[in-house]
Amino acid sequence: MKAVIQRVSEATVRVDGKKVGSIERGVLVLLGVEKGDETRNADWLAEKIVNLRIFEDDGGKMNLSLMDIKGELLSVSQFTLAGNCSKGRRPSFDTAAPPEDANHLYQYFNGKIWEMGIPVQSGIFQADMKVSLINDGPVTFILETPKREP
């Protein structure tokens, strides 16, 4: 499971011109689910994102988490994060989870964040979405869940 997380002062996702999710201060998460990902991956990622200290304290140091600031989270599924661009000029999505599995884990991830007390807004799975944001900083991180040891 891969996530691009961005600290935002606001973010919105639209489908067919209609706003389907919007947050103020918080984190925008672009989430990609890969073959072999399980609920344990979503658990790890949710815990990491909610507690990652990427917000500034009064001294200007990144010392506060999403939980600390009582921020919001906008979750957008993005299967292209599972794309492999190492060969040729067209990305391969062979490592992307099948849609049914990906949607299940995407919804599970959103539920875990909600259970932790963070307000969650989301896009629509498999929809063509338009995402707008004000990246605060800018602060952007790429997270990848640990792979299972063979």
Swiss-Prot record:
One of its GO terms (cellular component) is cytoplasm. It catalyses: glycyl-tRNA(Ala) + H2O = tRNA(Ala) + glycine + H(+); a D-aminoacyl-tRNA + H2O = a tRNA + a D-alpha-amino acid + H(+). Signal peptide: none annotated. InterPro entries: Daa-tRNA_deacyls_DTD, DTD-like_sf. Its main location: cytoplasm. Keywords: Cytoplasm, Hydrolase, RNA-binding, tRNA-binding. A motif (Gly-cisPro motif, important for rejection of L-amino acids) lies at residues 137-138. The keyword RNA-binding applies. GO terms for biological process: D-amino acid catabolic process. A Gly-cisPro motif from one monomer fits into the active site of the other monomer to allow specific chiral rejection of L-amino acids. This is D-aminoacyl-tRNA deacylase. The lineage of its organism: Bacteria, Pseudomonadati, Thermodesulfobacteriota, Desulfuromonadia, Geobacterales.
